[in-house]
Amino acid sequence: AGVIAVAVGFYLFLQEGVHSKMQRRLGALLLAGGLFAPLSRGPWIGAAVMIVMFIGTGRYAVRRLMLLGFAAVLALPLLAIVPGGQKIIDLLPFIGSVEAENITYRQRLIDNSLIVIQRNLWLGSFDYRSTPEMQSMIQGQGIIDIVNTYIAVALQMGVIGLALFVGFFATIALGIRKAMRSFPKQDDESRRLGRALLATLAGILVTIITVSSITVIPVVYWSVAGLGVSYAQMARRLKRAETASSKSTLLQPW
């Protein structure tokens, strides 16, 4: 589901290249289905952040965000009265009632992890899993599931490692935002690409609060970060090329 959420972020940019409204809506519907099917609520929040961020950095942002919020408020009462709608509400993050034990586990994980982190505050510990607090988190499968990437980083590498981890992505986000200013026109394709990358990165940073950095997840967020760096470099090259072109035009004899 996390990979599908990232695909949603990319689709925010790619959809403008699809001229058929039917195909555009079908693509959005397929992505929505793929996002909903695993019933993993963390990527749902991440996808929502992507959409809000993308709209918020575009034209008529305030008006469109108000319309989006109004539509969401209207949708909840409608779901409550349609057949099967209550089941959907129960699955929603923050307001749903399904998997309450999952929320309890996450709360215990935060509480116990903070105790362990305080013992090795600056540089973390390689054997944090053997501590009594972490051993008490062993689940039925015999594993300790650290379902929060930031906590996992802090446990392994301490506050210094966590600051470097967060600072890396914050620097890239600021670089993307700065690069977007090189394209002042709201309908510029390059600016829209920056909006999509910034929204996708923000969504990922929210999603990894709820998931472990296992399998392809680190590959995804490092890859998106790399795309952000490439976008910032592209904007700088274009700006230098435009500056050089302007100077050469001024130096041409009349």
Model-derived segments and their meaning:
Residues 1-4, 40-42, 154-158, 210, ...:
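Membrane-interface micro-motifs in multi-pass membrane enzymes
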Residues 1-57, 69-73, 173-181, 202-204, ...:
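Alpha-helical transmembrane segments of multi-pass inner-membrane proteins
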Residues 2, 151, 155, 161-174:
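Transmembrane alpha-helices of multi-pass, membrane-embedded glycan-processing enzymes
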Residues 14-18, 61, 176-184, 214, ...:
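Membrane-interfacial segments
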Residues 23-24, 187-197:
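Membrane-interfacial loop-to-transmembrane alpha-helix junctions, especially the N-terminal start
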Residues 29, 35-38, 55-97, 101, ...:
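A membrane-periplasm/extracellular boundary helix in multi-pass inner-membrane enzymes
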Residues 69, 171, 197-254:
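Transmembrane alpha-helices of multi-pass inner-membrane enzymes
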Residues 84, 89-157, 178-185:
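Long extracytoplasmic/lumenal interhelical loops at the membrane interface
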